[in-house]
Amino acid sequence: DVLFNTNVVSQVRFLGAWTSTGYTKIERTATWDYLQAFIDEGKKLGLKVFAAINTFPGGNTTSLGSEGVVFRDNTKRAWTTELNTSNGIKSIMDVQKNAKFFNPVRDDVREYIISMLEDLAKYKDLDGIVLDRGRFDGFESDFSTYTRAKFEQYIGEKVINFPNDIIPPGTEVGKLPNPLPKHFKKWLEFRAKVIHDFMVTARSRVKAINSNVQFGVYVGGWYSSYYDVGVNWASPKFITSSKYSWASSLYHNFGYAPHMD
């Protein structure tokens, strides 16, 4: 749910805030455009205004309850990621995780998110858009039949022992098996390509609407283990495999730094 004008998803209905009585649900009663108000006031003060968006989560659960499109719309619920847990492959909706991520591999998910970004770009005085959580949920994501088929298409062969030939259930980042599973490096490469290609398309679509708006991302600086969320935020000139044993020879091709302002 959002605080800007769009027909793609619903407006925020409540937010949590710490008050004198503790963490409290604050119902939204205002009908004015929150983002436009920030733009207007920011410009009066000579400030630049950037809009941040939680990219791939479709809902969130807190002590105040569950909110988000995946809790209201069964079609969108079906887009959520499936995790390679130690107890089998499970929907993120069925495990104890607060943020309910979509599967970034899905074409319908990508179009859904980009449509929202296009609406953000229509704010003519907005200085920039920053994507947070523009990534996979984590190392366990995504092991749906949809993603398996896309991966098999990418490598040109069937994965016979799934998911063990990719990542054995329960594998932790930084505690990789030796030797690495048959398709492990290509899997990391595939995921990095998924996020890279999303960013390239999203930037192009945003710039087509507003060429002046800046496009950027918020990422973690721990590059050596950031493969767990499928993100290569480096320059493609940095040959990842020369430094890290988990990277394929092509992993560096999907560094998306040149596509950020």
Q: What are these model-predicted stretches?
A:
Residues 1-2, 123-127, 260-261:
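Catalytic domains of carbohydrate-active enzymes, especially glycoside hydrolases
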Residues 118, 204, 254:
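Active-site phosphate/pyrophosphate- and oxyanion-stabilizing loops and adjacent acidic/basic residues
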Residues 2-57, 186, 190-209:
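Aromatic-lined substrate-binding rim segments of carbohydrate-active enzymes
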Residues 49-51, 129-132, 215-217, 261:
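Hydrophobic faces of well-ordered beta-strands that scaffold small-molecule active sites
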Residues 115, 123, 128-131, 137, ...:
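Active-site neighborhood of glycoside hydrolase catalytic domains
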Residues 28, 32-40, 50-124, 173-185:
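Active-site-adjacent "subsite" loops/lids of carbohydrate-active enzymes
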Residues 58-66, 139, 199, 208-261:
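Substrate-binding cleft/loops of secretory-pathway carbohydrate-active enzymes
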Residues 2-17, 57-95, 133-174, 228-242:
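Aromatic- and acidic-residue-enriched segments that line the glycan-binding/catalytic groove
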